[in-house]
Amino acid sequence: KYAVFGESYQTIGNVSLYGKIGYVNNRKQEVNWNGMTGDCWRGINLCDSVSGNQRSEQYQLSGAFSLPVSSHWLMGSRFDYLVDLNAKDTDPRNENQWMEWKITPGVGYECGSHRLGASIFYGNRKETVDYQNIGTHTTYPFFVSYPLGYFKTLPKGENIKWYYSAQEFGGFLQEEGVYGRFRLFQQIGGNLVRQNIVSDRIQNKKEGETDGWKLDYKGIGSLVSPLNRHEWSWKVLFDKSDSYDLLQQQEENMGTWHSSG
């Protein structure tokens, strides 16, 4: 694995600017039971049982700015964009194309030794998973994995190409205060996410849906003295998701699929 990054901070007048660009090349050996780029897709994942080597290339781009609007208030925003290309060199071969972007505007307030912040974000993710058996002698099966260790075998002799998409919306509240030598930071946030999986976008054949939400709280406390620094952190997380393996029926004339449950 190797990576190259470029990062810069600039101040032009009252505006603070930040930018980052990166490239990551990674190779993994003896990979199996994992045909996805990451662990974002909660409910329904493609996989296979044959070990093989995987190579991935990742491209990252981020930018942000902040601008004071008064002696106590400031505003800013951040944008993140990522592309990940992944391929396996052994049948059954999964080729993945991942793209995601997220925009996060926010405001901050500072008064003395206390700071308050609030931000919202919207994100969009897409992944195309193309599973193929290129060799002509042996056809290996593909599997769909579900939570709690459940699996389903897909029909043999067919190549699989599924399209994953997700939309996510959420926000955070932050508070930081200094009390003598003790500093306390707290953050609470949450998000809603909707995920869809389609195997035929023209005929609208859906393979599954997932609705989820998450609430999390974290805190960091630090105590600083001339000779020592002590730091504590804690976190509480609630995460829930409902996944649906849809029942569908195909129209005889138009060929379009309709979900019934």
Briefly describe each language-model feature range.
Residues 33-45, 121-165, 194-208:
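Short, flexible helix-coil linker/hinge segments at the edges of structured domains or between repeats
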Residues 4-10, 61-67, 103-109, 171-177, ...:
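Residues on the lipid-exposed face of transmembrane beta-strands in outer-membrane beta-barrel proteins
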Residues 66-89, 98-101, 187-200, 235-239:
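Surface-exposed extracellular loop regions of Gram-negative outer-membrane beta-barrel proteins
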